[in-house]
């Protein structure tokens, strides 16, 4: 029996990334974006386009537009949803997650869900801060998936 393992790599050469970032909760989303851009720079990504949207709920529509453009190897969706005293948190978080997954499946382009859902801003800063920046981690996933999809296309 022959077993082949196909994995993506963390190489940025020849990779083009589209980033959709929400402005709402920008103290957190700016940190996520900073972490992602740091990752892309360290891995020599050639082209990154950043598109800002009002809030996390608007991310799926713009992610769809970027994915369908044919210009990007992966799309990274960054946002922050902070729990309040209403059910709005759950509605937004669930719909954004579903929307991002649908865009990825429908377009065939990896769309990475980089929307943090937190109880309060302190928890958000712990996830988007200097000690641990989820933006960097989500960017790594975008790189890995972009390269994996390229490899899978070569196998067809």
UniProtKB/Swiss-Prot annotation:
<keyword id="KW-0686">Riboflavin biosynthesis</keyword>
<comment type="function">
    <text>Catalyzes the formation of 6,7-dimethyl-8-ribityllumazine by condensation of 5-amino-6-(D-ribitylamino)uracil with 3,4-dihydroxy-2-butanone 4-phosphate. This is the penultimate step in the biosynthesis of riboflavin.</text>
</comment>
<dbReference type="GO" id="GO:0009231">
    <property type="term" value="P:riboflavin biosynthetic process"/>
</dbReference>
<feature type="binding site">
    <location>
        <position position="127"/>
    </location>
    <ligand>
        <name>(2S)-2-hydroxy-3-oxobutyl phosphate</name>
    </ligand>
</feature>
<protein>
    <recommendedName>
        <fullName>6,7-dimethyl-8-ribityllumazine synthase</fullName>
        <ecNumber>2.5.1.78</ecNumber>
    </recommendedName>
</protein>
<feature type="binding site">
    <location>
        <position position="113"/>
    </location>
    <ligand>
        <name>5-amino-6-(D-ribitylamino)uracil</name>
    </ligand>
</feature>
<feature type="binding site">
    <location>
        <position position="24"/>
    </location>
    <ligand>
        <name>5-amino-6-(D-ribitylamino)uracil</name>
    </ligand>
</feature>
<comment type="similarity">
    <text>Belongs to the DMRL synthase family.</text>
</comment>
<dbReference type="GO" id="GO:0005737">
    <property type="term" value="C:cytoplasm"/>
</dbReference>
<feature type="active site" description="Proton donor">
    <location>
        <position position="88"/>
    </location>
</feature>
<dbReference type="InterPro" id="IPR034964">
    <property type="entry name" value="LS"/>
</dbReference>
<comment type="pathway">
    <text>Cofactor biosynthesis; riboflavin biosynthesis; riboflavin from 2-hydroxy-3-oxobutyl phosphate and 5-amino-6-(D-ribitylamino)uracil: step 1/2.</text>
</comment>
<dbReference type="InterPro" id="IPR036467">
    <property type="entry name" value="LS/RS_sf"/>
</dbReference>
<feature type="binding site">
    <location>
        <begin position="56"/>
        <end position="58"/>
    </location>
    <ligand>
        <name>5-amino-6-(D-ribitylamino)uracil</name>
    </ligand>
</feature>
<dbReference type="GO" id="GO:0000906">
    <property type="term" value="F:6,7-dimethyl-8-ribityllumazine synthase activity"/>
</dbReference>
<dbReference type="GO" id="GO:0009349">
    <property type="term" value="C:riboflavin synthase complex"/>
</dbReference>
<keyword id="KW-0808">Transferase</keyword>
<feature type="binding site">
    <location>
        <begin position="80"/>
        <end position="82"/>
    </location>
    <ligand>
        <name>5-amino-6-(D-ribitylamino)uracil</name>
    </ligand>
</feature>
<dbReference type="Pfam" id="PF00885">
    <property type="entry name" value="DMRL_synthase"/>
</dbReference>
<feature type="binding site">
    <location>
        <begin position="85"/>
        <end position="86"/>
    </location>
    <ligand>
        <name>(2S)-2-hydroxy-3-oxobutyl phosphate</name>
    </ligand>
</feature>
<dbReference type="InterPro" id="IPR002180">
    <property type="entry name" value="LS/RS"/>
</dbReference>
């Amino acid at each position: 029996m022959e077993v082949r393992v196909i994995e993506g790599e963390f190489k940025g050469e020849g990779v083009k990334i589209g980033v959709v970032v929400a402005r709402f909760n920008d103290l957190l989303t700016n940190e996520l974006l900073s972490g992602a851009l740091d990752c892309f720079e360290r891995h020599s990504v050639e082209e990154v386009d950043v598109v800002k949207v009002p809030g996390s709920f608007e991310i799926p529509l713009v992610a769809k537009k970027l994915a369908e453009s044919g210009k990007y190897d992966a799309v990274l969706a960054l946002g922050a949803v902070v729990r309040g005293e209403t059910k709005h948190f759950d509605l937004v978080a669930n719909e954004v997650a579903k929307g991002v997954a649908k865009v990825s499946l429908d377009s065939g382009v990896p769309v990475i869900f980089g929307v943090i859902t937190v109880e309060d801003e302190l928890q958000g800063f712990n996830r988007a801060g200097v000690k641990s920046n989820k933006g960097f981690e989500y960017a790594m996933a975008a790189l890995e998936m972009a390269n994996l999809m390229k490899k899978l296309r070569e196998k067809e």
